[in-house]
Amino acid sequence: MAKSKDARIRVLLECTSCVRGGVNKESTGISRYITEKNRHNTPGRLELQKFCPYCYKHTIHGEIKK
């Protein structure tokens, strides 16, 4: 039998430096990525290094609630 797919969920990752800095004067928004994670393997909040087009560098993107 096929296993249920309830362990893998879709999450939003948001740039922490854009949010913390209150969005710089030259930036026009907040970078967000959509990805999936396995709830059983990663029960805590997910944090990944991603490129932020508003900060023009690689920053930590943390999981947020939908």
From Swiss-Prot:
Subcellular location, principal: plastid
UniProt entry keywords in alphabetical sequence: Chloroplast, Plastid, Ribonucleoprotein, Ribosomal protein
Annotated PROSITE patterns: RIBOSOMAL_L33
A Gene Ontology biological process term: translation
Subcellular location: Plastid, Chloroplast
Organism placement in taxonomy: Eukaryota, Viridiplantae, Streptophyta, Embryophyta, Tracheophyta
Name the UniProt record assigns to this protein: Large ribosomal subunit protein bL33c
Keyword Plastid: yes
NCBIfam families, sorted: PRK00504.1 (NF001764), PRK00595.1 (NF001860), rpmG_bact (TIGR01023)
Pfam families referenced in this protein's UniProt entry, alphabetically: Ribosomal_L33 (PF00471)
Coiled coil (residue ranges): none
GO molecular function: structural constituent of ribosome
Family: Belongs to the bacterial ribosomal protein bL33 family.
